[in-house]
Amino acid sequence: MGQAAWKGFVLSLFDYKTAKFVVAKSKKVGLLYRVLQLTILLYLLIWVFLIKKSYQDIDTSLQSAVVTKVKGVAYTNTTMLGERLWDVADFVIPSQGENVFFVVTNLIVTPNQRQGICAEREGIPDGECSEDTDCHAGESVVAGHGLKTGRCLRVGNSTRGTCEIFAWCPVETKSMPTDPLLKDAEGFTIFIKNFIRFPKFNFSKANVLETGNKHFLKTCHFSSTNLYCPIFRLGSIVRWAGADFQDIALKGGVIGIHIEWDCDLDKAASHCNPHYYFNRLDNKHTQSISSGYNFRFARYYRDPHGVEFRDLMKAYGIRFDVIVNGKAGKFSIIPTVINIGSGLALMGAGAFFCDLVLIYLIRKSEFYRDKKFEKVRGQKEEDNVEVEANEMEQELPEDKPLERVHQDEQALELAQSGRKQNSNCQVLFEPARSGLQENAFVNMKPSQILQTVKT
């Protein structure tokens, strides 16, 4: 028995099992299935492969370097500064040319400051006082300019004044001018040189045209047809970012310069081109008290006596952030097979949906359900039925088969209950039989026929 079991197991390893298909002649379900197949196929071809290019291996670990250079000059003539010519060393910070740089467009200058004793500026709450006890000596003025000396300085007969402080005097008191100091900054140019590399594919490129013409960068400007001349006019960048130059030059702001690289390496390297986008990154709402961008810096000097003094400058301007992003794709068999397999799985989901419609939703669903699902008894149940049938046959007389006994019993019962009615007698003819014999049973469908005869 054990050897037979093992033999059957070993032989079963070489069996091939296949599905049994039922062809349903339903035009509605068939049409639905073809529509689903066509939809999935179009999704796979158009969206997955043509648009998303999911047959490619993608590299998003972009390595990038940015070098910037600003050029231009501006002339001013003010009461405080007199006639002055401004060049890149005056208005570009930092001068190294990094991916974040600042261009000064407006200034508030407080010249000739020296360390000493003076009054705090009005309008600073912690620096206001009514008497000397309001100014604690040695304390710094919150959001102010120096350390309190302990004295309250009042002008004339006023009851309110400001604390005396030790600071760089005189303190900054001027307000913002109504017009930007460097109006001509709109015509400055910015040269943005970008080098990128995708390490997975060992692919490198720059946004500057490879040419031997030394005068190319001196004569060209960026345009939609000249992508490899990354020289931008400052006013154009601000306009492309959706801002007004005179407004942003007065109070300052932050502009984002985005460089996008989307490279299909299945094509030639000439098809891998940079794309530029510009937007304003800071809070540009006019009602906000924190709008704009500014900071302070100083230039220090010494007088003939060796005493240090400085010119304090509060600079307003535009900060530019150069942000580089990108990805590269190249054909790979692995993502291709994965996406084809996903499409085939969607095909199977479509067939499953059509099965649900066929066996549950349409008018003849019960008929198709009976054809699709076949009930088969297990081997043990078949053996039990066969044993019971054999036992019943052995209990009957040999000359009376099982179906004949059933007929005799029915005829006897009807004869005992029969009676005459109006000199007529109901005679029960032998019932008609139909059916097939399965497992020693006969499926009987008796059809009793009553016939009236005269006596």
UniProtKB/Swiss-Prot annotation:
<feature type="transmembrane region" description="Helical">
    <location>
        <begin position="31"/>
        <end position="50"/>
    </location>
</feature>
<feature type="glycosylation site" description="N-linked (GlcNAc...) asparagine">
    <location>
        <position position="77"/>
    </location>
</feature>
<dbReference type="GO" id="GO:0010043">
    <property type="term" value="P:response to zinc ion"/>
</dbReference>
<dbReference type="Pfam" id="PF00864">
    <property type="entry name" value="P2X_receptor"/>
</dbReference>
<feature type="transmembrane region" description="Helical">
    <location>
        <begin position="340"/>
        <end position="362"/>
    </location>
</feature>
<dbReference type="GO" id="GO:0098794">
    <property type="term" value="C:postsynapse"/>
</dbReference>
<feature type="disulfide bond">
    <location>
        <begin position="263"/>
        <end position="272"/>
    </location>
</feature>
<feature type="binding site">
    <location>
        <begin position="294"/>
        <end position="296"/>
    </location>
    <ligand>
        <name>ATP</name>
    </ligand>
</feature>
<dbReference type="GO" id="GO:0009268">
    <property type="term" value="P:response to pH"/>
</dbReference>
<dbReference type="GO" id="GO:0033198">
    <property type="term" value="P:response to ATP"/>
</dbReference>
<keyword id="KW-0325">Glycoprotein</keyword>
<keyword id="KW-1015">Disulfide bond</keyword>
<dbReference type="GO" id="GO:0007166">
    <property type="term" value="P:cell surface receptor signaling pathway"/>
</dbReference>
<dbReference type="GO" id="GO:0036179">
    <property type="term" value="P:osteoclast maturation"/>
</dbReference>
<feature type="disulfide bond">
    <location>
        <begin position="118"/>
        <end position="169"/>
    </location>
</feature>
<feature type="disulfide bond">
    <location>
        <begin position="135"/>
        <end position="163"/>
    </location>
</feature>
<feature type="binding site">
    <location>
        <position position="189"/>
    </location>
    <ligand>
        <name>ATP</name>
    </ligand>
</feature>
<dbReference type="InterPro" id="IPR001429">
    <property type="entry name" value="P2X_purnocptor"/>
</dbReference>
<dbReference type="GO" id="GO:0005524">
    <property type="term" value="F:ATP binding"/>
</dbReference>
<dbReference type="InterPro" id="IPR003048">
    <property type="entry name" value="P2X5_purnocptor"/>
</dbReference>
<comment type="subunit">
    <text>Functional P2XRs are organized as homomeric and heteromeric trimers. Homotrimer. Forms heterotrimer with P2RX1.</text>
</comment>
<keyword id="KW-1133">Transmembrane helix</keyword>
<dbReference type="GO" id="GO:0051592">
    <property type="term" value="P:response to calcium ion"/>
</dbReference>
<feature type="topological domain" description="Cytoplasmic">
    <location>
        <begin position="1"/>
        <end position="30"/>
    </location>
</feature>
<feature type="binding site">
    <location>
        <begin position="69"/>
        <end position="71"/>
    </location>
    <ligand>
        <name>ATP</name>
    </ligand>
</feature>
<dbReference type="GO" id="GO:0001614">
    <property type="term" value="F:purinergic nucleotide receptor activity"/>
</dbReference>
<dbReference type="GO" id="GO:0006821">
    <property type="term" value="P:chloride transport"/>
</dbReference>
<keyword id="KW-0813">Transport</keyword>
<keyword id="KW-0675">Receptor</keyword>
<keyword id="KW-0547">Nucleotide-binding</keyword>
<keyword id="KW-0407">Ion channel</keyword>
<dbReference type="InterPro" id="IPR027309">
    <property type="entry name" value="P2X_extracellular_dom_sf"/>
</dbReference>
<feature type="topological domain" description="Cytoplasmic">
    <location>
        <begin position="363"/>
        <end position="455"/>
    </location>
</feature>
<comment type="similarity">
    <text>Belongs to the P2X receptor family.</text>
</comment>
<feature type="glycosylation site" description="N-linked (GlcNAc...) asparagine">
    <location>
        <position position="157"/>
    </location>
</feature>
<dbReference type="GO" id="GO:0005886">
    <property type="term" value="C:plasma membrane"/>
</dbReference>
<dbReference type="InterPro" id="IPR053792">
    <property type="entry name" value="P2X_RECEPTOR_CS"/>
</dbReference>
<feature type="disulfide bond">
    <location>
        <begin position="129"/>
        <end position="152"/>
    </location>
</feature>
<comment type="function">
    <text>ATP-gated nonselective transmembrane cation channel permeable to potassium, sodium and calcium. Unlike other P2RX receptors, the P2X5 receptor is also permeable to chloride. Acts as an important regulator of inflammatory-related bone loss and osteoclast multinucleation.</text>
</comment>
<keyword id="KW-0067">ATP-binding</keyword>
<feature type="topological domain" description="Extracellular">
    <location>
        <begin position="51"/>
        <end position="339"/>
    </location>
</feature>
<dbReference type="GO" id="GO:0042802">
    <property type="term" value="F:identical protein binding"/>
</dbReference>
